Amino acid sequence: MATFKDACYQYKKLNKLNNAVLKLGANDVWRPSTLTKRKGWCLDCCQHTDLTYCQGCLIYHVCEWCSQYNRCFLDDDPHLLRMRTFRNEITKSDLENLINMYNTLFPINKKIVHKFANTIKQHKCRNEYSTQWYNHFLMPITLQSLSIELDGDIYYIFGYYDDMHKINQTPFSFTNLISKYDMLLLDSINFDRMAFLPLTLQQEYALRYFSKSRFITERRKCIEILHFSDNILDNLHNPNFTLQVIRNCSNMSVEWNKACNIIRNISDYFDILKSSHTEFYNISPRCRMFTQYKLKIASKLIKPNYVASNHNSLATEVHNCKWCSINNNSIVWNDFRIKNVYNDIFNFIRALVKSNLYVGHCSSEEKIYESIKEVLNVCKENEWNMLVTEMFNQLEPIKLNENNYILLNYEINWNVMNVLINSIGKIPKILTLSDVILILRIIIYDWFDIRFMRNTPMTTFTVNKLKQLYEKDRTAEHDSRISDIE
């Protein structure tokens, strides 16, 4: 069993404060929740198990038992998970406050050890101290944490996480912050606690302490789309789809890294608890991560032969053509924005191909097809620029005065005309590489302006940021027919 979970269960009986702070879903009556096969550590009870997604941020980091309380490390409520969460720069003073909170909630002294020894109903001889029955005493105070980076903000969720060698399918990575504190001082604190334990438990306590305080920090992971709820991927292609999140809120008004100090004044803590409530937010899924996911799916459906064709139809509306007809049954086309981008991109590229290469039918095989297959994946800027440069060079540009030029003398649709006029000021007859890159970008940015998108969705905002955006009516897209440029 998880040491942290056991400690919360036993120490919850100690006093009124502990009963309020150490309440875990994993130690209460189980309520069913959606399970997945993702393995990792539940941030709430610190046990390694199958995880479900959090209702507050939609990331997989909570177990099926703890999910009933809907706690998130981004909440604005003084529950234990939030008080164990630190952000960005952490000072020695902050770590001192964390250690003091641990000592307050999980004390070890002669009186406490005697009290638990008298109340624990073990099945062996009373004089034997089995780790099975005294697991809660074997949770040392360490600076072990799971960390995650969300658009420049780094969050550290401290706790006692067993079995660090086990599989981790979450975006969190183990971080050891003992270097920001005093190693010898932390040793002294734990040795003082350990001295009150029976000799048979001291050895196990020491082994656990050194294994969790001397480990090497892992390389920080990059958060990916697979770390979010599967429900998002099922609905992402609906342009009217919004993400629904639940956040725990209160009138707690302290600096982020000072939340663990609240329990110093018990009356103030319970006053804050009285103001606890939940807030619901509908949030737009617009972000670079989800946009890239949709554009990648569309890229797999590309029919590059269209750029050599003579079809009068738009690229997504060609039927009964072996080389140009796309799979219209794909869910990605439910998003009209993807269709608009696809049609305009291929209308423009076809005009370039027809203006510069001698091709007459979509059945012809051209080298330029390979360069076109990833033209929608603009999120990877360097790779995309190289791809467009390769495509430009395959259009057999003419070199004049150190610059390369290609022609544009083939018909284009009204949307592309507007892009040319807005970007260059006219409909040009010759184009440079920079012109082509600019035009292709604007066609995509018209609906998916990744320049101003966060990498992750707004579900990873703190409550304060969500409130600010909600007041400005900026958490959701109300009119899906309005483009990013508009």
UniProtKB/Swiss-Prot annotation:
GO terms for molecular function: metal ion binding; RNA binding. Keywords: Host cytoplasm, Host cytoskeleton, Host-virus interaction, Inhibition of host innate immune response by virus, Inhibition of host IRF3 by virus, Inhibition of host IRF7 by virus, Inhibition of host RLR pathway by virus, Interferon antiviral system evasion, Metal-binding, RNA-binding, Viral immunoevasion. Pfam families: Rota_NS53. One of its GO terms (cellular component) is host cytoskeleton. Residues 1-81 are annotated as: RNA-binding. The keyword Transcription does not apply. Plays a role in the inhibition of host innate immunity by inducing the degradation of key host factors required to activate interferon production such as IRF3, IRF5 or IRF7. Associates with components of cullin RING ligases (CRLs) including CUL1 or CUL3, which are essential multisubunit ubiquitination complexes, to modulate their activities. The integrity of the zinc-binding domain in NSP1 is important for degradation of host IRF3. This is Non-structural protein 1. It comes from Rotavirus A (strain RVA/Human/United States/DS-1/1976/G2P1B[4]). The lineage of its organism: Viruses, Riboviria, Orthornavirae, Duplornaviricota, Resentoviricetes.
